[in-house]
Curated annotation (Swiss-Prot):
Induction: By paraquat, drought and high salinity. The active site is at residue 165. A motif (Nudix box) lies at residues 147-168. Its EC number is 3.6.1.-, 3.6.1.13, 3.6.1.22. It catalyses: ADP-D-ribose + H2O = D-ribose 5-phosphate + AMP + 2 H(+); NAD(+) + H2O = beta-nicotinamide D-ribonucleotide + AMP + 2 H(+); NADH + H2O = reduced beta-nicotinamide D-ribonucleotide + AMP + 2 H(+). Its cofactor is Mg(2+); Mn(2+). GO terms for molecular function: ADP-ribose diphosphatase activity; metal ion binding; NAD binding; NAD+ diphosphatase activity; NADH pyrophosphatase activity. GO terms for cellular component: cytosol. Disulfide bonds: none annotated. It comes from Arabidopsis thaliana (Mouse-ear cress). This is Nudix hydrolase 2. It is an enzyme of class 3 (hydrolase).
Length: 278
């Protein structure tokens, strides 16, 4: 595959006038990041020359990053065989595969990550909301606070943030209790939904006006007896798991900060069962 850049692509002084500027990536490919305006015909000439040179050099994937102000060059790249890989608010990434065999390029992001927050207080009341928008609006359904984890945000931090935004309640993350995977959920992408247990640090509710119709602390038994919960298989399993956790019969996954040579992340694991073996 071909992605992040590491070193400058060597070229002669003559090459520099006929090739697009590029850097080599870690996977035998090259990355070109366009930063200055260029006439499409000149861009086409340089791109063809570059592809010929990179082919002779045995390169594989070719990435072209176009900022939005240079989006007019995208048509030229597509005519040369490039295709869209992904886009962000300020750039478009295109890619081309030189070898004859099937490409091994990494796919665009395949999943969206969401959370559902199980927050229960000392009175065995669960924090629930009714939504102003979305699939459940206007149906009188009480549900856990839910939301999407932001780019670069840890799952546990996202769950705390979503609860605060939707209800005004401060919480402390406890554990991930379960997760669900579905496909073709959002613009054809798959979805990972993590059920998180959080401990309330405050009880006063201040519902988010833009998204939340109502919020309250609801007795747990009243919540699980809603027809919507009883008739929805996923929610029945979720409530069984949450009940088992509350009763001490179930252990979820706790985050452990871990590091690798070039990045940091979190390992979520069952601390109780692991420690019981030692």
């Amino acid at each position: 595959m071909s992605a992040s850049s590491s070193s400058t692509n060597p070229m002669s002084r003559e090459d520099a006038t006929t090739l697009l500027p590029s850097v080599q990536d870690k996977y035998g490919g090259v990355m070109t990041e366009m930063t200055h305006p260029m006439d499409p015909s000149l861009f086409s000439t340089l791109l063809r020359s570059s592809l010929s040179t990179w082919t002779l050099q045995g390169k594989k994937g070719v990435w072209i990053k176009l900022p939005k102000q240079l989006i007019g060059l995208a048509e030229t790249a597509v005519k040369e065989g490039f295709w869209f890989h992904h886009a962000e608010k300020d750039y478009l990434m295109l890619v081309y595969w030189i070898p004859k065999e099937d490409d091994t390029l990494p796919a665009n992001a395949s999943h969206r990550v969401g959370i559902g927050a199980f927050v229960i207080n000392h009175n065995k009341e669960v924090l629930v909301v009714q939504e102003k928008t979305g699939r459940f609006q206007g149906q009188g359904i009480w549900k856990f606070p839910t939301g999407v984890v932001n780019e670069g945000e840890d799952i546990h931090d996202g769950s705390v943030r979503e609860v605060k935004e939707e209800t005004g309640v401060d919480t402390e993350f406890d554990q991930i209790l379960a997760f669900r995977q579905t496909h073709k959920a959002f613009f054809g992408k798959s979805d990972l939904f993590f059920v998180c247990m959080l401990k309330p640090l405050s009880l006063e509710i201040n519902a988010q006006e833009s998204e939340i119709e109502a919020a309250q602390w609801m007795p747990w038994e009243e919540y699980i007896n809603q027809p919507f919960v009883q008739n929805y298989e996923l929610l029945r399993y979720m409530t069984d798991i949450c009940s088992a956790k509350t009763n001490g019969d179930y252990e979820g996954f706790t985050p452990l900060r871990v590091s690798a040579p070039d990045q940091q992340g979190n390992l979520y694991y069952n601390t109780r069962d692991l420690h019981s073996r030692n």
